[in-house]
């Protein structure tokens, strides 16, 4: 029947589009990260709003952005070397746990109404340092999450779609949250979202990596 053939064709096309999701480890990763990325974008927008509300300074917003980005630029070579040498799963657990702690400290400072601009900038530097290691770890771990090497490109495409979707959804939601509960609870929610990521990573069953030959850090 033509209708049956059309449905089979659509089903086959969907399987190709989402073929990386056949891998259990990748499903866990994408599920945990989808929630966390949305709330992370909520924190970014809420933090910018808090800084501007408190300081009424565009320059302060510039300092905040600079503080969050400069560590990744300076530490990229070192981070890549560490990712090659150390267990990627445990590196990701460490970076996510540290990011969770950063969010909780930020939430406490704002909710207790004791936060200052320079404390917030310092915490942005801390998060930038964490992200400098976190981003290459994610990229390297992706190869271990798919069942077939040919699914890697699809996994990267789905990950990019998820990231861009989070950029759209997070800022859309955070405006309502700021009005209703304030910036501090947005930061608290971000910290709690990392629990989903840590649970997903803990549930993964990854094959042991072959032992790497000892190498110097920069060559």
What are these regions (language model features)?
Residues 2-219:
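Alpha-helical transmembrane-bundle signature of multi-pass membrane transport and export proteins
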């Amino acid at each position: 029947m033509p209708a049956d053939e059309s449905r089979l064709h659509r089903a086959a096309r969907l399987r190709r589009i989402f073929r990386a999701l056949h891998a259990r480890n990748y499903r866990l990763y994408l599920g945990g990260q989808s929630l966390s990325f949305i709330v992370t974008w909520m924190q970014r927008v809420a933090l910018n709003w808090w800084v501007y509300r408190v300081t009424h300074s565009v320059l302060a917003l510039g300092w905040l952005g600079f503080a969050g980005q400069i560590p990744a630029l300076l530490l990229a070579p070192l981070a890549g070397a560490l990712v090659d040498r150390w267990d990627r799963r445990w590196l990701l657990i460490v970076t996510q746990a540290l990011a969770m702690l950063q969010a909780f400290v930020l939430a406490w400072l704002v909710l207790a109404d004791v936060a200052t601009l320079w404390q917030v900038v310092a915490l942005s530097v801390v998060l930038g340092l964490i992200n400098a290691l976190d981003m290459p770890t994610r990229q390297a771990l992706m190869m271990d999450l798919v069942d077939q090497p040919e699914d890697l490109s699809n996994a990267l495409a789905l990950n990019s779609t998820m990231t861009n979707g989070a950029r759209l959804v997070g800022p859309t939601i955070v405006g309502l949250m700021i009005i209703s509960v304030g910036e501090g609870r947005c930061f608290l929610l971000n910290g709690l979202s990392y629990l989903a990521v840590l649970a997903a990573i803990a549930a993964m069953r990854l094959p042991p990596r072959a032992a790497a030959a000892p190498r110097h850090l920069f060559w």
